[in-house]
Regions:
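Terminal, low-structured helical/coil segments at or just beyond the last alpha-helical repeat
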Residues: 121-151
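Canonical positions in the second alpha-helix
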Residues: 16-17, 50-51, 84-85, 118-119
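Register position in tetratricopeptide repeats
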Residues: 3-4, 37-38, 71-72, 105, ...
Length: 151
């Protein structure tokens, strides 16, 4: 349900899973991300932190925590969690891309493009995402950006 954008259904399904098994770290993680995407980042943080308490080695939850912090506007904390993903999974495309978007949002153009280039080297499909997302809108006249994404 989460991958199709049906956040309410994802929240319902994971809440049912948690009722069946209160120690289901994956369910807390997914519910936290879905809840944050649905607009309640405070509850989203609480659920992803609970998932971390239950399973501190769940790398997928690190990513979800990074995204929830990003949605909350806590960019340094978000970057820290993307970096934790990369410690365990150095070629995690969307964590590399996530760091690129944070640098873009913070106005550090050189680092944003360096990280974007790394993400594209891992997975060229990143080009089309970067070309369309708001994070990089102001880069559309930047020669290096145009070369990287093929604009």
């Amino acid at each position: 349900a989460l991958s199709t954008g049906d956040y309410n259904k994802a929240i319902e399904e994971t809440t049912a899973s948690i009722k069946d098994n209160p120690n289901n770290a994956d369910a807390y993680s997914v519910r936290g991300f879905a809840t944050a995407l649905n607009g309640d980042t405070t509850k989203g943080i609480a659920d992803t932190k609970k998932a971390y308490d239950l399973d501190p080695n769940n790398v997928a939850n690190y990513y979800n925590m990074a995204m929830v912090y990003k949605l909350q506007g806590q960019l340094p904390e978000s970057k820290r969690w993307f970096e934790k993903v990369l410690e365990k999974d150095p070629s995690n495309t969307w964590s590399v891309y996530g760091i690129a978007t944070i640098y873009a949002d913070q106005g550090d153009d050189t680092k944003a493009l360096d990280w974007l280039e790394k993400a594209i080297k891992i997975d060229p499909s990143v080009k089309s995402v970067a070309a369309e997302q708001d994070h990089f809108e102001r880069f559309h006249n930047n020669a290096r950006f145009k070369t990287l994404v093929g604009l």
